[in-house]
Amino acid sequence: MSAASDDEFPCYLRAYFPCRIDYTKFILGEDSHDLRFTVTLDPVPRKNPLMVIYDGPTDDGDTLVTISKPKDHLGKLSTTIQVSDIATVLSNRFDDIHRLYKFSLKVGGSRREKFEWRPSEGKEVQEMFRHAKGYKLVRLKSVGPGAGKGGKRKDRQLDETSDGKEVVAVWATKKSLVPSNLRMDVKPFKFELRASGKSGELGSEFGYFALATALRIWSYKALGITGFRITD
């Protein structure tokens, strides 16, 4: 798999949209002078991937990640994320009142761990935008930086959940009073690796999977793209 231009996955990314009302192609970068990835999005119910992430500031670069169309089966949405020859499935249920998104991944060689995106308006998310909302990625088999004490938001350690787990990534967008399917402009997207997600402990592929799963959830929460009945 081709890597980003400086051979390290960036810890922070934001989306840049060439057109404010077109979300089918956008660029991710640490800032407007350091554009790292191009993302194409196909919202039509056909067999093309939902998203493809390319290396560099155009879609002429190498394909780094493919994100399948989410498939709806018996109230469960499943999205396949492919990075090189490694794949995982991001899943969630419509009847899940906690709105959790789950996947598993091999980290540190052969050890498989479970991860969970949880909705959040905590400090890690609020740092990204004024009036932000988003999700935090929780490493389920972990102890947070506050020795796993957890607790209420105002009291607990940064990058630790209320149940004492480690937060390894976050993504955020801006709150809006207008439903996503009625908005004419594109809601923003910011992403950041944190704690062991940032240190490299979770492996060289982790950043790509964290980013791809974050973009999939953003496409639903901010753009209203849900499940598909795939046609030719």
Q: Where does each model-flagged region fall?
A:
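Extreme N-terminal segments of fungal proteins
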Residues: 1-83
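Eukaryote-biased feature marking scaffold/signaling PDZ-domain proteins and nuclear chromatin regulators
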Residues: 21, 46-48, 76, 96-98, ...
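Extracellular-facing segments of soluble proteins and assemblies that are Gly/Ser/Thr-biased and enriched
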Residues: 71-107
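Beta-strand elements of modular eukaryotic interaction domains
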Residues: 15, 41-42, 90-93, 126-127
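Predominantly extracellular/luminal cell-surface or secreted proteins
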Residues: 52-56, 106, 140
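Ordered hydrophobic segments in well-structured contexts
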Residues: 38, 50-52, 102, 116, ...
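Low-complexity or membrane-interfacial segments used for flexible interactions
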Residues: 1-34, 109-232
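Short beta-strand segments
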Residues: 63-66, 87-90, 113-115
